[in-house]
Design a protein with these regions (language model features):
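N-terminal positively charged helical leader segments and presequences
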Residues: 1-68
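Structured adenosyl-cofactor binding patch, chiefly the S-adenosyl-L-methionine
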Residues: 204-221
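Short amphipathic alpha-helix with an adjacent loop that forms part of the alpha/beta core around
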Residues: 156-162, 179-188
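Mobile, glycine- and charge-enriched loop segments
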Residues: 37, 62, 68-80, 186-192
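Short acidic/polar active-site loop segments enriched in Thr and Asp
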Residues: 102, 191, 217
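RNA substrate-binding interface of SAM-dependent RNA methyltransferases
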Residues: 70-168
Length: 221
């Protein structure tokens, strides 16, 4: 069954008005009156709905029932991704959305060979957010991850304190691995996890040292 998001609470809206979604419903999926859809509202609650009218600019529905299924992870995972070359961030954003991350933040590390140019940032972020939106629908998410504006490494270090724990994957780490580290945690007390992933060229030893000195756990897969 196809899923759609609305920006209001379900009690305040009985319409899908996102024009891309309206076109997708009527022209691509060719849904009709009485067809069922899934609607997720601004509170990230999921509802089974029935289409009752389709016009050029909106789709009207009625709520059949709330769907009480836990779709999201019990912890917010924020991925700080080193800016990769080319269009790789498109695929990264799509796959991270599909596996349940909460938000994605591009980071400019020293060894990044690419960057998101300031004059193209808004357009790039908007395109990535559209990719995330479609991936959230396809993977039955109730939360649409947000792709944040790129940050510098210094900004990343300051950001670490906003998370319960932070981890970084480093190719030179040989002892501490992801599985054993998470086995040692009481995840019921963890609200958010910052996951730091470097660019193709890796993270410099100096960056790793600074991350570790600010409480980040250095791990190998």
């Amino acid at each position: 069954m196809d899923r759609f998001f609305i920006r209001q609470e379900i009690s305040q809206s009985t319409f899908i008005e996102n024009q891309e979604d309206v076109k997708h419903i009527s022209k691509v999926l060719r849904l009709r009156v009485n067809d069922k859809i899934e609607v997720v509202d601004s509170n990230e609650k999921e509802y089974l709905c029935e289409i009752i009218a389709i016009s050029k600019d909106r789709v009207e529905y009625k709520v059949i029932e709330e769907v009480a299924i836990k779709r999201e992870l019990g912890v917010q995972i924020k991925v700080y991704q080193g800016v990769p070359k080319g269009q790789k961030l498109d695929l990264i954003a799509q796959k991270l959305t599909e596996i349940g991350v909460y938000s994605i933040i591009p980071v400019e590390f020293k060894r990044c060979v690419s960057s998101i140019k300031e004059e193209k940032e808004d357009k790039k972020i908007a395109r990535l957010q559209r990719i995330i939106y479609e991936a959230a629908k396809q993977s039955k998410r109730n939360h649409i991850p947000k792709i944040e504006s790129p940050m510098t490494f210094k900004e990343l270090v300051k950001e670490l304190k906003s998370n319960t724990i932070n981890i970084v994957f480093y190719e030179c780490e040989e002892e501490n691995n992801l599985k054993s580290y998470f086995a040692s945690l009481d995840l019921s007390k963890v609200e958010s996890i910052g996951v730091i992933v470097g660019p193709e060229g890796g993270i410099t030893p100096e960056e790793i040292e600074l991350l570790e000195s600010n409480g980040c756990k250095v791990l190998t897969l």
